[in-house]
Amino acid sequence: MLQNPELHYLDNAATTMVAPEVADVIDKAMREHWANPSSLYGPGARSEEALNTARAAVARTLGCKSRELYFTSCGSESNNLALLGAVRTRTFGKGIVVSGFEHPSVQRPLEELAKQGYDVTVVKPRPDGTLDMDRMLEHVDKNTILVACMMVNNEVGTRNDVERLAAEVKRRNSRTIVHVDAVQAWMRVPIKLDNIDTLSVSGHKIHAPKGIGALYLSDRLVQAFRPPYLGGEQERGLRPGTENLPYAMGLAAAATRLAKTMKSRDTAMRALNQRLREGLKAFPEVEINSPENAVPEVLNFSENCIKSETMLAWLAEAQIYVSSASACGRGQPSHTLATMGKDPLAIDTAIRVSFCGDNTPEDVDAFLDRFEDGMKHLQRIRK
């Protein structure tokens, strides 16, 4: 996909490049499906048909009904829509339980709900970055209206067993809503929606463009669901505003494309991850932050010597692009590493490498070579 062989893009947890075939679908849709899907005349009817086809394609990759799939602008909007709308369907309590390493688009709405009188309990992860499920379940009782947990952490790649969590939550209180942020999980790990009520995904993490996402909203909730904003009747009245049909079609194309290669990509990602881990063993200062159960697409480590921004600039000079934390927390220390109990030096020197199916062993080797030079050169300057 890369046109420049000298460029090594290893920040795919932040965003992915739009696949050429996805861009082609969008370009064609912009030329052929320009009419408003809500219009009653011929071109509008054809746009509506294309929208329904795209919805069905995305729904198939999630294993849900088409009517349970709502297009949004991004994963962050999906999270906000799910959380702020779902709590308004429950009047029997005020309890909310959430994991301590959520994306800001989950953290901030829940902080706002806490100001409104909801009892929000944040459960820290274990020191290795894994979900402390027992502690989360301890807080679920008859007054718990919502439990939220991301499926794959965006900073360290932790894979959380949200299916088991959802089942245990429902066993304790069948009326508790379970929300899952699956933005980093979709098309990386299998998703089973049993006992999950709402789930968010995003296009730009799977080689679709920025500006398109989706929300799964279970039939169990839809009748009582009260969206936080109002307007037109698009998306069955839950998400007002004329639908972005070309991007919805692009999202469907991207999801369909990746659904065919999940197993082979997983094997390739594991090989790249292991190659990087082996290479990092040459540096005694390096501490791996990603837990053993992390998805292979993400490897987070601290080199405990050079500040992240300095090392990132050094790597970028050679067109090697990685990150230090979540792109959504630009300029901020890693929230996830802090909740894991990492010390300030580890947080200040953390680097996240994240792969996609277009990456190669040469990308890893280029990173390791430049990283080694940086460790030598930058430490000399510091001294």
Model region roles, listed by residue range:
Residues 1-383:
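Pyridoxal 5′-phosphate
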